[in-house]
């Protein structure tokens, strides 16, 4: 496994390694990128294993992107565990790209940015203004740097996945997006690097989010209103959890559905559990 921190090295390393592994039309010549912000956990391992299953050279990026953190958010305290991350990836990834912010943004944070459009201002975007512009900017840069054929993302960040897919389509980027299902703890809590912020009481309450989603899924036969009511009742019964948003969105447009909507959708939830903000989602079908 090669660990790289410098753009000059990574710009050609992944593709050069891929070509060396086989003919240009062989699976070994494929580059598969797994973008992360580090503080890796079993959910990330699942993404990397999926990347390995796709065949080719697996590149994992580790970069805490300042552009996607707003004022008052947790940029400074976001966990940085590079040594442990590299050890975890040994034997799984072929290349780890772990640049400093100055390497990614040599002109500073006022450099050219990608904008997420109208959907980028909804839900997570409304709660975290500018977040998705920053996320798309760094993902676009990583696509240009690593030149992947495939990029792997987790379904837990459903709005992120939607927006990355839109960017790829709108800008005609030659990248296929692969999505891996959310990995959960035994009690249903979605794995997240932010889970380590939870104290004992908050950790016990955090599973409320996945239970609320499960209650919503169970109520699908009653339509959108029944889904939202069932999920909201569960959340309101847990005083440690403060709801940010609970919404059903069309899987295709990521817009909030009408009360009489029928078809595939995502049930999204975001809440503060103690002092920690968590998100989750489930696929649903409204009959």
Curated annotation (Swiss-Prot):
Residues at which ATP binds: 37-44, 154-157, 183, 191-194
Listed GO biological process terms: pantothenate biosynthetic process
Residues of the active site: 44
Top-level class of the enzyme under EC nomenclature: ligase
Cellular compartments annotated: Cytoplasm
InterPro entries membership: Cyt_trans-like, Pantoate_ligase, Pantoate_ligase_C, Rossmann-like_a/b/a_fold
Pfam families: Pantoate_ligase
GO MF term set: ATP binding; pantoate-beta-alanine ligase activity
Catalytic activity: (R)-pantoate + beta-alanine + ATP = (R)-pantothenate + AMP + diphosphate + H(+)
Major localization listed first in the record, in broad terms: cytoplasm
Gene3D superfamilies in the record: HUPs (3.40.50.620), Pantoate-beta-alanine ligase, C-terminal domain (3.30.1300.10)
Keyword Disulfide bond in annotation: no
EC identifiers of the protein: 6.3.2.1
Pathway: Cofactor biosynthesis; (R)-pantothenate biosynthesis; (R)-pantothenate from (R)-pantoate and beta-alanine: step 1/1
Keyword Transport recorded: no
Cellular-component GO terms for this entry: cytosol
Binding residues for beta-alanine: 68
Keyword terms of this UniProt record: ATP-binding, Cytoplasm, Ligase, Nucleotide-binding, Pantothenate biosynthesis
Residues involved in (R)-pantoate binding: 68, 160
Additional information: The reaction proceeds by a bi uni uni bi ping pong mechanism.
Function in brief: Catalyzes the condensation of pantoate with beta-alanine in an ATP-dependent reaction via a pantoyl-adenylate intermediate.
Matches recorded under NCBIfam families: cyt_tran_rel, panC
Family stated for the protein in its record: Belongs to the pantothenate synthetase family.
Quaternary structure annotation from Swiss-Prot or TrEMBL: Homodimer.
Protein's name in the database: Pantothenate synthetase
């Amino acid at each position: 496994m090669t660990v790289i921190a410098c753009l000059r090295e990574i710009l050609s390393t992944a593709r050069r390694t891929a070509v060396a592994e086989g003919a240009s039309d062989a699976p070994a010549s494929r580059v598969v990128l797994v973008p992360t912000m580090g503080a890796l956990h079993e959910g990330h391992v699942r993404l990397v294993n999926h990347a390995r299953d796709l065949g080719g050279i697996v590149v994992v990026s580790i970069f805490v992107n300042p552009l996607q953190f707003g004022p008052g958010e947790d940029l400074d305290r976001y966990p940085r565990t590079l040594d442990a991350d590299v050890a975890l990836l040994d034997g799984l990834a072929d290349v780890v790209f772990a640049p400093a912010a100055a390497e990614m943004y040599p002109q500073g944070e006022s450099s050219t940015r990608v904008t997420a459009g109208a959907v980028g201002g909804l839900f997570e975007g409304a709660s975290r203004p500018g977040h998705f512009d920053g996320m798309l900017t760094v993902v676009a840069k990583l696509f240009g740097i690593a030149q992947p054929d495939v990029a792997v993302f987790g379904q837990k960040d459903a709005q992120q996945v939607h927006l990355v897919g839109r960017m790829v389509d709108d800008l005609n980027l030659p990248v296929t997006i692969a999505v891996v299902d959310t990995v959960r703890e035994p009690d249903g809590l979605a794995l997240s690097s932010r889970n380590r912020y939870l104290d004992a009481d908050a950790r016990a309450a955090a599973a409320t989010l996945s239970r609320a989603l499960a209650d919503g899924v169970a109520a699908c036969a009653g339509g959108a209103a029944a889904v939202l009511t069932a999920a909201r009742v569960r959340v309101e019964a847990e005083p440690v959890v403060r709801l940010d948003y609970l919404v059903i969105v069309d899987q295709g447009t990521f817009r909030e559905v009408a009360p009489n909507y029928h078809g595939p959708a995502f049930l999204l939830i975001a809440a503060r559990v103690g002092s920690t903000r968590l998100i989750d989602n489930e696929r649903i079908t409204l009959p």
